[in-house]
Curated annotation (Swiss-Prot):
Positions in coiled-coil regions: none
UniProt subunit comment: Homodimer. Interacts with GraR and GraS.
Protein known as: Auxiliary protein GraX
Domain of life of the organism encoding this protein: Bacteria
Pfam families, per database record: Epimerase
InterPro entries cross-referenced by the UniProt entry: Epimerase_deHydtase (IPR001509), NAD(P)-bd_dom_sf (IPR036291)
Functional description taken from the UniProt entry: Plays a role in resistance against cationic antimicrobial peptides (CAMPs). Facilitates the activation of GraS to transduce the signal to GraR.
Gene3D superfamilies, sorted: NAD(P)-binding Rossmann-like Domain
């Protein structure tokens, strides 16, 4: 029986090359956020609808796979606007891939090198116990992420990493984020949290800007799923998600917004709402660094705070 091989990055030149080389020796599968646009008669391959940055979709796509091949090009994004570094996108995708491979008991992950972040990527892929091999083939990737691209939907992806304050858990970070938005003057909002939901309001307003469901997606991943509110564009296939991801064996938390389709007219979102969101998350990042500094001082560490 032929092994089942999953290709991440099967839509580009490298994917086409690999699929042609191993077509006769394996049952091929490839993932794409929009697989209907990728089907070809050149190679016998099964396309799976999957966004590599969406943890649960990657886990589902890797079901019954024997070997998984990881290659992504940071210049080819699946969102209309992507505000993130190539490094952060690569590491989030690799973390998803490594987690999914371990859950599905994939025999090995094969990585195609050629990025400045090869060592970090290989570490992420193997962080959950799956063996990782690298190919002799090296394919150089761009170090610059492309912010605006043509996309099926007017969706947004952005990432920011913050430090996990000493002695905190990921749940502490999420709860602090919710509270911080409410008491920080510069955000101009107030927040309410009840059980597994929280709401954001403009101060002195009754109708919420956004209502989120808080969901513990996996160990080390907490997702705030957008349910309703004045910032929500109605009748969209997917609603936005704000994911908090703790990188295993580190003090790094990624805050990842994806699947969000703004209600505002696109240029207004890009030039007004997006910069405000970025400024708010940056403010939270600074606050987390201060909290980490304070926690370390309390524990007796001798250190100086630097911006």
């Amino acid at each position: 029986m032929k092994p089942k091989v999953l290709l991440a990055g099967g839509t580009g030149y490298i994917g086409k090359y690999l699929s042609e080389v191993i077509e006769n020796d394996a049952e091929l599968f490839a993932i794409s956020k929009y697989p209907d646009n990728k089907k070809t008669d050149d190679v016998e391959m099964t396309w799976i609808q999957c966004d590599i940055f969406h943890y649960e979709q990657v886990v589902a796509a890797m079901n019954q796979i024997d070997i998984a091949v990881f290659f992504i090009d940071p210049t080819k994004n699946s969102a209309k606007i992507t505000q993130s570094s190539a490094r952060d996108l690569t590491l989030i995708a690799a973390d998803n891939f490594g987690r999914a491979a371990a859950i599905n008991q994939v025999k090995k992950v094969i990585y195609i090198p050629g990025s400045r972040y090869d060592n970090e990527t290989i570490e992420r892929l193997g962080a959950y116990g799956t063996p990782v091999e690298t190919t002799n083939l090296v394919f150089k990737r761009s170090l610059v992420n492309v912010e605006l691209q043509v996309s099926k939907y007017d969706d947004v992806r952005s990432t920011m990493k913050v430090v996990l304050p000493k002695g905190w858990t990921l749940k502490n970070v999420v709860n602090h984020f919710i509270a911080w938005m409410g008491y920080t003057k510069g955000t101009f909002v107030k927040t309410e949290k009840s059980h597994d939901q929280f709401k954001i309001y403009i101060k002195n307003k009754v109708r919420p800007l956004a209502v989120f469901k808080i969901e513990e997606t996996a160990d080390g991943i907490i997702t705030l799923i957008l349910l309703s509110g004045s910032l929500v564009k109605k009748y969209t296939v997917n609603q936005g998600k704000l994911e908090f991801r703790l990188i295993k064996e580190s003090a790094v938390v990624y805050i990842h917004l994806y699947d969000y389709i703004p209600r505002l007219f696109w240029p207004i979102y890009y030039f007004i709402q997006a910069p405000m969101q970025k400024m708010m998350i940056h403010g939270f990042e600074v606050d987390c660094r201060i909290k980490d500094f304070q926690s370390r001082l309390k524990s007796g560490e001798n250190m100086k705070y630097t911006k």
